[in-house]
Design a protein with these regions (language model features):
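Interdomain hinge/linker at the junction between the two RecA-like core domains of SF2 helicases
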Residues: 1-35
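C-terminal helicase lobe
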Residues: 37-55, 61, 65-103, 107-178
Length: 178
């Protein structure tokens, strides 16, 4: 029913959603985006993947100047390293960050031109948090959806490693009721 529709007062009309979910060669696609040399955050779901993608992009990049602008970021880095990466990104020394959701919490950099969701977000809240990094200065910015069907399976695997499965929850519930 239309009378139940809620309009979000925080809609940012400067953001352009780019549906790239059909892309087969993600690294090649990212390499093309890297060549634009605009502030970009590529969000991934694991620390390992952040490191792997940063290395793959460096390996493919023929431009030494651009190669030095690529960096990975995750919560496992030392606090001093994270601060330095944030500072260098803010100042334009770095322009292409591959990160877990750690690069988003408490970080307000207005001129981020591209946010790439390489993997499927774990929740709507996380999606909004990550996508919301783009275009905070009011300029046109892009949110690129690069995830695919396999990412659903990856999320389920990652969640299963950190969350109890149904059988364990049932057993726990029965134990509480006994």
């Amino acid at each position: 029913h239309f009378d139940e529709l809620i309009i979000d007062g925080h809609i940012r009309e400067n953001l352009i959603l780019d549906d790239c979910r059909g892309v087969k060669e993600k690294i090649a696609w990212l390499s093309e985006l890297l060549a634009e040399d605009e502030k970009t955050i590529v969000y991934v779901n694991s620390r390992r993947k952040a490191v792997e993608i940063a290395q793959s992009l460096r390996d493919r990049c023929g431009d030494e100047r651009l190669k030095r602008k690529i960096c990975y970021y995750h919560g496992g880095l030392e606090a001093s390293d994270r601060k330095m990466i944030e500072k260098d990104f803010r100042e334009g020394i770095l322009s292409f960050i591959i990160s877990t959701s750690a690069f988003g919490e408490g970080i307000d950099i207005g001129d981020i031109k591209h946010v790439v969701l390489y993997h499927l977000s774990f929740s709507c809240e996380e999606y909004n948090q990550l996508a919301g990094r783009a275009g905070r200065n009011g300029e046109k910015a892009y949110i690129h959806l690069l995830y695919n069907e396999r990412d659903k399976n990856l999320n389920e695997l990652l969640l299963s490693e950190n969350c109890p499965n149904r059988e364990l929850l049932v057993a726990f519930y029965k134990a509480l009721r006994a």
